[in-house]
UniProtKB/Swiss-Prot annotation:
Location (main, coarse): cytoplasm
Name of the protein in its database record: Histidine biosynthesis bifunctional protein HisB
This protein's UniProt keywords: Amino-acid biosynthesis, Cytoplasm, Histidine biosynthesis, Hydrolase, Lyase, Magnesium, Metal-binding, Multifunctional enzyme, Zinc
Active site feature: 10, 12
Stored Pfam families: Hydrolase_like, IGPD
One GO term describing the cellular component: cytoplasm
Compartments (UniProt record): Cytoplasm
Binding-site positions, Mg(2+): 10, 12, 130
InterPro entries: HAD-like_sf, HAD-SF_hydro_IIIA, HAD_sf, His_synth_bifunc_HisB, HisB_N, Histidinol-phos, IGPD_sf, ImidazoleglycerolP_deHydtase
Species assigned in the record: Mannheimia succiniciproducens (strain KCTC 0769BP / MBEL55E)
Record-listed E.C. numbers: 3.1.3.15, 4.2.1.19
Length: 365
């Protein structure tokens, strides 16, 4: 059997809602599908094989009788089948963490057949799940993970990431807009790679979890793909890592955009959610930056909120762009996320190719 593109998909919290009370789906009343999971799987099924992989603590014991599991589980499968969605395999670990078994995710014994017989294509297979253990499972399998989240990475976004094909020659203008920038100092060792004309799965690892998520928001909302890796002096603080990634990313974007012929050049967005974020961008060739925001705490996770301004200032400097950013709101997490999303959306407008003209009366940018 040849290697196949495969999605190893978690069940509770990914395909169906996981109750936060007891984390067990043991009745039909608790069965609730995640939003748009069925339309997404219908789009994905022609490209990928589906394998369900799930930890079910104490399944078959008094704390979780088999019959209590079977009824909602079989109902879930019946709904999927009625819509044309089939799982090639369903792999379940019934053990609790304290049992120290070899099959509980993120361990890989459940998937031994797929590993030994090389049944999945490592270059085009993914683990989809809502927990860090799903991400670790992907690492143990040598493939990539998509950590599902109903707001930050929902099923619509997952389907878009997995199905967006590379655009080898956008608008017939020649080479694809791609760049690689490596930057090494005493404090950081960074590599940034961007593909402006394709979207897909971004591989980002800076050692700062919240920052990784924010960088992914730029690419996702910008409609492009990027890989970012950084080893920095986080034992001191996060300053050098965030600043140097911004400098490298700005340089990579500038290089990928190239001579700017045919681009829109300008972008402006004003998204309204619980926060009001405003972003205006001009790929002018002249760096200028203005920022207005107040945060009510010093940290979001392991990310210093004061570094938000410094990140965008640094990216404007190496991108050679005029950038205005502001946000109003009460929640620092939401404020910062709104800024990164707004920047991504604005960048999406500015780098879009519409013709072959130089967007400047001077004839050069």
């Amino acid at each position: 059997m040849t290697q196949q593109p495969t999605l190893f998909i978690d069940r509770d919290g990914t395909l169906i809602d996981e109750p936060k009370t007891d984390f067990q789906i043991d009745s039909l009343e608790k069965l609730k599908f995640e939003r748009n999971v069925i339309p997404a799987l219908l789009k994905l099924k022609n490209r990928y094989r589906f394998v369900m992989v799930s930890n079910q603590d104490g399944l078959g014991t008094d704390s979780f009788p088999q019959e209590d599991f079977d009824k909602p589980h079989n109902a879930m499968l019946a709904v999927f089948r009625s819509q044309g969605i089939e799982f090639d395999d369903i792999l379940i670990c019934p053990h609790k963490p304290e049992d120290n078994c070899d099959c509980r995710k993120p361990k890989i014994k459940l998937l031994k057949k797929y590993i030994d017989k090389k049944l999945f294509d490592p270059a085009d297979s993914f683990v989809i799940g809502d927990r860090p253990t799903d991400v670790q499972l992907a690492e143990n399998l040598g493939i990539r993970a998509l950590q599902y989240h109903p707001e930050n990475l929902d099923w619509d976004m997952i389907a878009e990431k997995l199905l967006r094909e590379p655009v080898a020659d956008p608008k017939g203008l020649g080479q694809p807009r791609h760049a690689v920038v490596a930057r090494k100092t005493k404090e950081t060792d960074i590599k940034v790679e961007v593909w402006l004309d394709e979207a897909g799965v971004n591989q980002i690892n800076t050692g700062i979890g919240f920052f990784d998520h924010m960088l992914d928001q730029i690419a996702t909302h910008g409609g492009f793909r990027m890989n970012v890796s950084c080893k920095g002096d986080l034992h001191i603080d996060d300053h050098h890592t965030i600043e140097d990634v911004a400098l490298a990313l700005g340089a990579a974007l500038k290089e990928a955009i190239g001579n700017k012929r045919g681009i829109q050049r300008f972008g402006f967005v004003l998204p309204m959610d619980e926060c009001k974020a405003e972003c205006a961008l001009d790929l002018s060739g002249r760096p200028y930056f203005k920022f207005k925001a107040k945060f009510n705490r010093d940290k979001v996770g392991d990310f210093s909120t004061e570094m938000t301004e410094h990140f965008f200032q640094s990216i404007a400097y190496t991108l050679l762009a005029t950038l205005h950013l502001s946000v109003k709101g009460d929640n620092a997490h939401h404020q910062i996320e709104a800024l990164f999303k707004a920047f991504g959306r604005t960048l999406r407008q500015a780098i879009k190719i519409e013709g072959n003209e130089m967007p400047s009366s001077k004839g050069v940018l």
